[in-house]
């Protein structure tokens, strides 16, 4: 997990993408499912442009056969607005040949200076 964290701080997009299979499948929150390293590279490039000063902490949770789970928390500055943001979530990685073949992620984000209620999240 620490190695993966290091690839986000600062962003090392080529190394991140190298950790995935050529035919990887990504299901990331409400982003429409996409496939392959080219689309993954574009996804990380878009995120790195938007998430200035990204700081990430991942914690390993489970490993069963070829499936690994982790939870994460992160903070960044929104590059467009300058607002400090935070996020947290859970990820499931299905591995093949030492690389991620399927990446599924669910997460919540919000302003770092605001506390969200259940009602806020459900809007």
Regions found by a protein language model. Give the residues of each.
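An acidic, carboxylate-rich microenvironment
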Residues: 15, 38-39
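Short acidic-aromatic low-complexity motifs
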Residues: 1-19
